Amino acid sequence: MKDKKMIRIKILKPKNCCVAIVLLFLVAGCKPKVYLMPTPAALQTGEHDPFARNPELEETNRVVVAYATNRMGVGPEDDRKYITLFDGYLRLGTAQIRIGSVNKTWKDIYSLSTSRERQSDIRLDLEAAKELAELNSAAPIDELSPEARLFFEGLNEALDRSLDKDLILYVHGANNNFYRASAQAAQFHHFTGRNSVVLFYAWPSAESFLRYAVDVNNAGRTVPVFSRLLELLGRYTKARHIDILAYSAGAQVVSPALALLRENHASENIGELKQQLRLGEVYFAAPDVDFKVFLENLATYIDLPQNVTLTVNPDDTVLALAAMHHNVSRAGSPDPDELSVEETRWVIDASRKMPLDILWITAETIPDMSSGSHSFWYSHPWVSTDVLIQFLFQARPAERGLVPYEEADGVRLWYFPADYPEQSSQAINRLKEERR
C-alpha cells in the first residue's frame, strides 16, 4: 500500500463526469450477451482442478441453477419468460444455461475453463427456465404449497449430492434481465467445479441504464420479498450455511433486507436465530447502495451472518455516476467525509473487532485491472480466485493470502499482494488440508 491518501475516497468530480457517462453507457450498452468470465488465476496452472474433485460431475456444456424471482412471469411453465413488472409473489424454478455452441463438447469447455488464453469469447445462452412453484411472500411461512415443497426438496437433493454443503445465493445488479442473472450464476457455479449449489435471485430490474430510477424503486419494493426468501431457505433447506453474493445494486435489496430480517426477529434469542437462519458469507461486490445507509443496515444485522465482506474500488466509474444520481457516495466507493466522528469510530471498530472484512480493490495493487472496473469480482482472475476460495472454504482474508493494511485512524483494509497467485495457491493447499 502507499499512503493514507489512497483511501480518502471521493465522489467523482464534475470535470470527469463526461468521461464517466461515456464509460457507463459503454458498460450498459455493450455485450448484451454474457460471455464466459476469464479463468480464475488458481485454475490456470493445472495445480488446482475443482472439476477433478467433483464426484458427481456431469461432463456437459449445460449448467442448471435454481432461481427465485419476483418478476412477473409469462408463457408456459416449462419455458417461462420473466418481464420487468414487479410481483409480490415469489416464483421458484430451475434454469438451464448452455456454455458455448451446441457443438461444444465437455472436453472443449474444460480446456477453456482451465486455460489463461482463449482464441474467442464463449457465449452463455439461457435454453429454458422452468417454473416449478409460486408462493405469496406475505403468507405465513408455514403455508407452503406442495409444489413449493417439491422445489425445496430438490434443493436439498442437490445439496446431498454436492461436495459443498452451503447454498450460494447470487443477487444481480441494475440494468439486468433474467437471462444475464442466470448466466452470471451459472458461470459462478461452473467455476466452483460445479461443486456448489447456486440459486440466483432475479429482482425486476428495468434492463436499461436510462431507467435506473425504476431499478432503484423496484429494488426497494423487493426488500420484504427477499427477506422472506431468506427465512424460507433457513426453514426448508438443509444447507449448512446460506451464503449471499450481492453485486452492485443488488446491495439495495440485500443490505436493507438483512436489516429488516433482524428487526423482525429483534426479540428472539440471537443464538437460536443464527442457528435458524444459518447465514454464512455475505459478500458485497461493488455495492451500489448509499454508504451511510449501508452502515446503518450493517450495524443492525452484523450479529446474524458469519462474516460480511465489503469490496471497495475508489475509482469505480459506474459507482461514481450512481453517486451523482443519488447525491451521496456508494458503499463500494465511499466518501468517509460523509460520516460523523461516531460513525467513523464504528467503522474502525467493525473492521477490527467485528465480522467485517473490507477489501481494497484497485489497479494500483492488482495488475492488469482497469482502474474504473465495476465487474472485478468476476472479470479479474485474481479477484475471482479470492471469491471462490472464500465461498468454498469459508476462509478469512489472511487465510486466503491477502495482506492487512491499517490506516492511520485505525481502519483495517485487506489488499492483494504482488505475489498473490503464489500466495493463493499455497492458501488453497493449506485450506484443503485443514478442511479434510
Predicted features along the sequence, with ranges:
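The conserved beta1-alpha1 loop
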Residues: 169-173
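Alpha/beta-hydrolase fold active-site loops
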Residues: 166
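Sec-dependent N-terminal signal peptides
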Residues: 18-24
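Gly/Ala-rich beta-loop-alpha elbow adjacent to hydrolase catalytic centers
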Residues: 226, 246, 250, 254
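C-terminal motif of bacterial Sec signal peptides marking the signal peptidase cleavage site
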Residues: 26-29
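Short substrate-entry loop that stabilizes the transition state in hydrolases
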Residues: 176-181
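N-terminal secretory signal peptides that target proteins for export/translocation
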Residues: 1-12
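Lipolytic serine-hydrolase domain surface
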Residues: 35-142, 153, 161-162, 182-186, ...
